[in-house]
């Protein structure tokens, strides 16, 4: 077992594989990992690591290169992204998820270093099957039949017996600790993500505010719901002078 795999195991993670991948003609490293004791099969979490100057692709030992590069590093730019198949892969305009991921990838590449943590948390943790049911409620259907009543995204989850947000980010903090990262700049407006990473002992130097300006009406409504839950998007808020004050995310 490599030193890196041992570090993952020490933080309750199982390191599956590391491989170079090409994203927008740039080489990143994709790290597949699972939570200890949880066999996710093909649905493992993914970490995408970028360090342009490190030349990972030419490294004789990827495990050693990753462990040596990130250990003790400060202000590592990072996006903790929850899976959204419709937004990320199909480029749905119902939400800003795909645009958030694209903006983060581009910003990390521009900076020359960073991490995308891609957690398999479809539908804010309720899974694809339940997400489809929630989307149906949002468009006024139930089991394929028109009901005449449309739910908001949050209320659709509640109507199905779920919490508004069932995600847990412990695994993300464990991942950063396994790499030995000291501090991070997080690309997020979600206070729950910030709090979870901070609770894992990783210092948050700053939060980076990236948001899509050209949103559909549907996506704008999703954004408004998130702001009502305490999300903070400073530039989005400032651009909307009539928006009521939002509670600060802790």
Question: PLM ranges: what are they?
Answer:
Residues 1-250:
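Catalytic domains of riboflavin
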């Amino acid at each position: 077992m490599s030193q890196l795999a041992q570090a993952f195991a020490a933080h309750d993670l199982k390191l599956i594989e590391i491989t170079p991948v090409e994203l927008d003609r740039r080489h990143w490293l994709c790290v597949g990992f699972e939570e200890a004791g949880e066999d996710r099969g093909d649905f493992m979490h993914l970490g995408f690591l970028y360090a342009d100057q490190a030349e990972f692709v030419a490294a004789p030992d990827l495990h050693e290169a990753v462990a040596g590069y990130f250990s003790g590093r400060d202000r590592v730019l990072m996006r903790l992204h929850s899976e959204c198949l419709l937004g990320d892969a199909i480029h749905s305009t119902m939400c800003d998820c795909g645009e958030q991921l694209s903006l983060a990838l581009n910003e990390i590449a521009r900076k020359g270093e960073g991490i995308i943590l891609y957690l398999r948390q479809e539908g804010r943790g309720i899974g694809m099957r339940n997400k489809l049911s929630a989307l149906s409620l949002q468009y006024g259907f139930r089991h394929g039949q028109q009901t005449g009543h449309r739910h908001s995204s949050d209320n659709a989850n509640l109507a199905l017996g779920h919490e508004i947000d069932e995600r847990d980010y412990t695994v993300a903090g464990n991942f950063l600790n396994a790499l030995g990262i000291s501090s991070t700049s997080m690309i997020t407006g979600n206070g729950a993500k910030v709090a979870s990473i901070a609770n894992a002992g990783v210092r948050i130097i700053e939060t980076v505010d990236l948001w899509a300006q050209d949103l559909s009406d549907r996506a704008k409504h999703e954004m408004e719901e998130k702001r009502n839950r305490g999300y903070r998007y400073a530039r989005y808020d400032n651009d909307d002078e009539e928006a009521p004050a939002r509670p600060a995310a802790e």
